[in-house]
A protein has these predicted regions:
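Mature extracytoplasmic/periplasmic domains
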Residues: 279-348
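N-terminal secretory signal peptides
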Residues: 1-14, 18-22
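Oxyanion-binding "anion nests"
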Residues: 229-249
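Paired acidic/hydrophobic, glycine-rich loop segments that form the ligand-binding mouth/hinge
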Residues: 91-94, 223, 240-245
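Extracytoplasmic ligand-binding site segments that recognize negatively charged/polar headgroups
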Residues: 75, 94-235
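Early extracytoplasmic/lumenal segment of secretory-pathway proteins
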Residues: 37-102
Length: 376
């Protein structure tokens, strides 16, 4: 029997509050659902890059359709976009796992039949992934994941020097600490550095202590960056340490000759997890289901893992097997070999905490703290 992850009572009002922080941004790029009723178009709300031909061209050809993507950055923006869009505007949404309970509570995603998807092909740890199940019912299927820790310039810092988040406060790091401008992973890392496990379920005293520690980093900061700016700042050396990001950025840079790596510090790291859901109100439920099946098939999983500019870990053992058979060098680089050390080791060693939304504070409280930090 599957069990749901305890999320508490979350109302539609809570859902709307989560999207307020990005409301203005969403308004400047409002989605126009011109293709909502076109049976040959799958409308897809997702993080950037997930409608790249490398990922979706095969699906489009097999089904005689085109995928139209509306891109967002950060779950708060995703919530704002989907809330402000007429029903039927989107058929599928790729969401971070920590936002699934808000999508479910607001009745924006369909219940899924587990038998429709290859969950038995997944690593056992991910077959009943708690953030995707509510009252024993499935609402999202994991597509990929990765770890967030401390990314660093390998010419300037040794692995020993960055074995703890304490490296962020070192004299050597002054003016060299870059921040991904999203409160959740950045503050989650600082919470871990303060010994909070789990890092997002903390009382007011621990929250205030975490804020104080965060604010003490301002003299160390080189800047607050978008995704594109993170890539460039690590490449040009302006940022030499960045908490709360991971190999989804540093692996691609390293393969292009940039001296960067990511470590999970002794205080632990975070796991980001992406999943696909069917948006309630879609007239193309069957096509949406086929797209999730395609993405979680061994072939779809290998493509998710090996996209040139955004390499990821995948939950499907069948995908791992196909990757090792067809692209063994990539499997080794991605630490997804079936023998020897691999990316599941950190998970099994309990070094990883799920990235989640704040439990004991409002999302706005964390966002406000982040804004205050940036304005110091």
């Amino acid at each position: 029997m599957r069990t749901s992850f305890p999320m508490g009572d979350i109302s539609r009002r809570s859902f709307l509050k989560a999207g307020v922080a990005a409301g203005a941004l969403a308004a400047t790029s409002r989605w126009s659902p011109a293709d909502a009723d076109d049976p040959k178009v799958l409308n897809y709300l997702s993080w950037p890059g997930n409608a790249d031909p490398y990922l979706v061209e095969q699906f489009e050809k097999e089904n005689g359709v085109k995928i139209r993507i509306k891109e967002y950055v950060g779950g708060d923006q995703m919530l704002a976009v989907i809330n402000q869009s007429p029903p039927g505007s989107f058929d599928v949404v790729l969401a971070d796992a920590e936002y699934m309970h808000l999508l479910h509570a607001a009745d924006f995603v369909e219940e899924l039949d587990p038998a429709d998807y290859p969950l038995k092909d997944f690593w056992p740890e991910f077959q009943n992934f708690p953030l995707h199940w509510f009252d024993g019912k499935l609402y999202g299927v994991m597509t990929d994941f990765g770890y967030l820790g401390l990314s660093y310039n390998t010419k300037e810092f040794t692995p020993k020097e960055v074995a703890s988040y304490a490296a962020l406060w070192s004299d050597k790091a002054k003016g060299k600490v870059g921040f991904f401008d999203w409160y959740l992973p950045s503050m989650g890392s600082i919470s871990l550095s303060n010994g909070n496990r789990p890092p997002f379920d903390i009382d007011e005293a621990k929250f205030e202590a975490m804020k104080e520690k965060l604010f003490s980093l301002k003299p160390q900061a080189s800047g607050f960056y978008t995704i594109a700016d993170i890539f460039s700042s690590l490449t040009n050396g302006r940022a030499q340490l960045v908490p709360g990001i991971g190999e989804w950025i540093t692996l691609g840079l390293r393969m292009n000759g940039v001296p960067v790596d990511t470590i999970i510090p002794e205080e632990g790291g975070l796991q980001w997890t992406e999943s696909l859901s069917i948006v309630k109100g879609t007239p193309k439920r069957d096509l949406a289901r086929k797209f999730i099946q395609y993405t979680t098939s061994p072939e779809g999983q290998v493509k998710m893992a090996t996209k040139v500019d955004n390499k990821k870990s995948i939950p499907s053992i069948a995908g791992w097997k196909l990757l090792n058979q067809t692209m063994p060098k990539e499997a080794e680089i991605l630490r997804m070999t079936l023998t020897g050390p691999n990316v599941m080791d950190e998970y099994k060693a309990k070094k990883i905490q799920f990235r989640q939304l704040p439990k004991q504070q409002e999302i706005a409280d964390w966002n406000d703290a982040w804004s205050e930090f940036k304005s110091l």
